[in-house]
From Swiss-Prot:
PANTHER family on file: BETA-GALACTOSIDASE RELATED (PTHR23421)
Protein name, UniProt field: Beta-galactosidase 1
Domain of life (superkingdom): Eukaryota
Subcellular localization, as worded in the UniProt entry: Secreted, Extracellular space, Apoplast
Reaction(s) catalysed by this chain's protein: Hydrolysis of terminal non-reducing beta-D-galactose residues in beta-D-galactosides
EC number annotated for this UniProt entry: 3.2.1.23
Top-level EC class as recorded in UniProt: hydrolase
Length: 847
């Protein structure tokens, strides 16, 4: 995944590759059970329309994986796609880690056990809004290295790790050619735009990477995404919000979409993006309509950036991504259900879709049909209305069809509509965070960091140092400390005009302490990580200690020349307003300390937390910077996902039983425009936004599997100052459920009943409502059959309303976990307005 959706898409085509390289392709294609042709990926000789979804194993827990995979399969997926995260698997050179939520083999085997395929994106560059793009930071310090180009040291390391992963998969017989689930692999990632910048070295590197990958003999095809000149036999694939315009670079390669972006990432300081289900479905249907055969949702489950894995910088801890399965693993409705219905409709068309290319038929200025036919007589059609503002009535095959704005109707038999991308049959679930009562409340203890105690663990040198090279990314924190002598005759001591301290930093945030007191803070943003602190500071006669806590908020994950990236206070650092004018502090002696004292003592762990004396009760200070807080609690009953509400805190990090939930920063409020958003029209990452003026992220996921029945240790490090008494444990659950369905809305169930011959008359659709596990429908908040207006949570009656609209739901739904009601006039006391297109809107409360 790249952070720049509009990067250049067209790259100069490459020259032909060697005969040996082509021979590798021929061996793979002929002998392997997975191959491809111009139309699709073929498995055991059979063309397949494949629906895939990204689930990144480190962004959830092993205990969550089976349920996530099950829900993905239930949602209609054929394939799970994941990156491989090099920095998680090789944290230091030659020291590998494949345990816990980095147990890649276990994850792949769970996918296999579910009956799904897997697309393994080895990279090993992943971008993914992941720290340093997935590269281990130690790569920076290999002599002569230059990342992602024709560079010997880099290529040697890349080949070594890629070979390690491939051999691991082979040893477990996990490639499809061995009977395993892996049907595709990916080498590199979104390299095309960078290759264009680099020129010849970039093209040489692309050719080398492709040849190296194919030479590993996996027996399955390799993919490169956003790589228009991917050498044969590599398939070049598309990433984006829409990919219907895309064509592979050779006529004998299939049209693949490796990243269909289901939403966008959240950044600290930014609103929360979302993508309407109708537009997501529209983009996928349009891709399939125009010849696409493989589509992967990025993300299908986004999950959580635990620990310090978030990149960016400034990527939030939540990687929810508005995915069909939310950060906690719950179905996001209606997106999950609407896409499930889409996948079922596409699969009904598969016999015709895989038979060849479509015939295009214009139906109007903004309307067209794409028709697929097979030699055996199968016929499927996609009717599209690209007008974002108005309905269209079109004629096709001697029938008339009404197409909503910006929508596509799917006709598996070239006659009957079973699905329209703008007509949502799935329920909408409104979620809430409910405070979990903790017996006796959370009783906090506190320990305050003191920069003056760092001398024994520090080093001193003249001038300013770069942060990443100094910390080696072992901590977010680096102290810059120096002394400033102020003469007693300085004018500001008498007139009260404070001297101004100016500190320039390459990123990402800083807190400035003068003589042990917090003087102020400054921070950048994802779009502008560099920052300047400029403020009047309270100095006294004699020696003054300036201590700057420089903070990294995730290392960048996208861009060229990783080896050159920097962070921290690079200067200049200066004082203005002294008798002598400006005093440059940059080249005097500075003392440095990597990390916090609390980190070196492991205060976040069960054992380390007992190594210092903690303040209790009335001695626990509020709004105090550089403070560690700890408390214990018992695990709440039930299975509902849990989170901590950090709304009362500023910025820092959180741990549960020694495991990091990630960075918290609720004090960074979201800046943006959260106006009403329509599903119609071209989507972009800033089109649909929530949370403007509020915390970018308030709640932080607590995996249930990290908890013990009692005595769970919660530790918070707070940089700015907050009120720990405002921290609460919450559970995520369904608040209310809604359905919004037209009287004659097409459904797959009704189509299949007709096709089976079990019924021979038109059938009305049904409204389905279901609360969460353990919940029941308690009340019907709103119900109207007629012309209701508004959206879920804010419905209102229109000019036409059936007065008995509530009756069926009160009778069939109240007291039940789930229910279904036929959307027909007789269910609501008769037709309230004949000759008017009616619909049902209902909202029911769950508890």
């Amino acid at each position: 995944m790249g952070s720049k959706p509009n990067a250049m898409k067209n790259v100069v085509a490459m020259a032909a590759v060697s005969a040996l390289f082509l021979l590798g392709f021929l061996v793979c294609s002929v002998s392997g059970s997975v191959s491809y042709d111009s139309r699709a990926i073929t498995i055991n000789g059979k063309r397949r329309i494949l629906i895939s979804g990204s689930i990144h194993y480190p962004r959830s827990t092993p205990e969550m994986w089976p349920d996530l995979i099950r829900k993905a399969k239930e949602g209609g997926l054929d394939v799970i796609q994941t990156y491989v995260f090099w920095n998680g698997h090789e944290p230091s050179p030659g020291k590998y880690y494949f345990e816990g939520n980095y147990d890649l083999v276990k994850f792949v085997k769970l996918v296999q056990q579910s009956g799904l395929y897997l697309h393994l994106r080895i990279g090993p560059y992943v971008c993914a809004e992941w720290n340093f793009g997935g590269f281990p930071v130690w790569l920076k310090y290999i002599p002569g290295i230059s990342f992602r180009t024709d560079n010997g040291p880099f290529k040697a390391q890349m080949q070594r790790f890629t070979t390690k992963i491939v051999n691991m998969m082979k040893a477990e017989r996990l490639f499809e050619s061995q009977g395993g689930p892996i049907i595709l692999s990916q080498i590199e990632n979104e390299y095309g735009p960078m290759e264009y910048e680099l020129g010849a070295p970039g093209r040489s590197y692309t050719n080398w990477a492709a040849k190296m990958a194919v030479g590993l003999g996996t027996g399955v095809p390799w993919v490169m995404c956003k790589q228009d000149d991917a050498p044969d036999p590599i398939i070049n694939a598309c990433n984006g919000f829409y990919c219907d315009y895309f064509s592979p670079n050779k006529a004998y390669k299939p049209k693949m979409w490796t990243e269909a972006w289901t939403g966008w990432f959240t950044k600290f300081g930014g609103p929360v993006p979302y993508r309407p289900a109708e537009d997501m479905a529209f983009s996928v249907a349009r891709f399939i309509q125009k010849g696409g055969s493989f589509i992967n949702y990025y993300m299908y489950h986004g999950g959580t950036n635990f620990g310090r894995t978030a990149g960016g910088p400034f990527i939030a801890t939540s990687y929810d991504y508005d995915a069909p399965l939310d950060e906690y693993g719950l179905e996001r409705q209606p997106k999950w259900g609407h896409l499930k219905d889409l996948h079922r409709a596409i699969k009904l068309c598969e016999p015709a879709l895989v038979s060849g290319e479509p015939t295009r038929m214009p139906l109007g200025n903004y309307q067209e049909a794409h028709v697929y036919k097979s030699k055996s007589g199968a016929c499927s059609a996609f009717l599209a209305n690209y007008n974002p503002k108005s309905y269209a009535k079109v004629s096709f095959g001697n029938n008339h069809y009404n197409l909503p704005p910006w929508s596509i109707s799917i006709l598996p038999d070239c006659k009957n509509t079973v699905y329209n991308t703008a007509r949502v049959g799935a329920q909408t679930s409104r979620m809430k965070m409910v405070r979990v009562p903790v017996h006796g409340g959370l009783s906090w203890q506190a320990y305050n960091e003191d920069p003056s105690t760092y001398i024994d663990e520090s080093f001193t040198m003249v001038g300013l140092v770069e942060q990443i090279n100094t910390t080696r990314d072992t901590s977010d924190y680096l102290w810059y400390m120096t002394d400033v002598k102020v003469d007693a005759n300085e004018g500001f001591l008498r007139n009260g005009d404070l001297p101004t301290l100016t500190v320039l930093s390459a990123g990402h945030a800083m807190h400035v302490f003068i003589n042990g007191q917090l003087s102020g803070s400054a921070y950048g943003s994802l779009d502008s990580p560099k920052l300047t602190f400029r403020k009047g500071v309270n100095l006294r006669a004699g020696f003054n200690k300036i201590a700057i806590l420089s903070i990294a908020v995730g290392l960048p994950n996208v861009g060229p020349h990783f080896e050159t990236w920097n962070a921290g206070v690079l200067g200049p650092v200066s004082l203005n307003g002294l008798n002598g004018g400006r005093r440059d502090l940059s080249w005097q002696k500075w003392t440095y300390k990597v990390g916090l004292k609390g980190e070196s003592l492991s205060l976040h762990s069960l054992s380390g937390s007992s190594s210092v004396e903690w303040a209790e009760g009335a001695f626990v200070a509020q709004k105090q910077p550089l403070t560690w807080y700890k408390t214990t609690f018992s695990a709440p009953a039930g299975d509902s996902p849990l989170a901590v509400d950090m709304g009362s805190m500023g910025k820092g990090q959180i741990w549960i039983n020694g495991q990091s939930l990630g960075r918290h920063w609720p004090a960074y409020k979201a800046v943006g425009s959260c106006s009403e958003c329509s599903y119609t029209g071209t989507f972009r990452e800033d089109k649909c936004l929530r949370n403007c003026g509020e915390a970018s992220q308030r709640w932080y996921h607590v995996p249930r599997s990290w908890l013990k029945p009692s005595g769970n240790l919660l530790v918070v490090f707070e940089e700015w100052g907050g009120d720990p008494n405002g921290i609460t444990l919450v559970r995520r659950e369904v608040d209310s459920v809604c359905a919004d369905i037209y009287e004659w809305q097409s459904t797959l169930v009704n189509y299949q009943l007709h096709a089976s011959g079990k019924v021979n008359k038109p059938l009305h659709p049904k409204a389905h409502l279901q609360c969460g596990p353990g919940q029941k429908i308690t009340t019907v908040k709103f119900a109207s059959f007629g012309t209701p207006e508004g959206t879920c949570g804010s419905y209102r009656q229109g000019s036409c309303h059936a007065h008995h609209s509530y009756d069926a739901f009160n009778k069939l739904c109240v007291g039940q976990n789930w229910c279904s009601v036929t959307v027909a006039p007789e269910m609501f006391g008769g037709d309230p307005c004949p000759n008017v297109m009616k619909k049902l809107a209902v909202e029911a409360v769950c508890a």
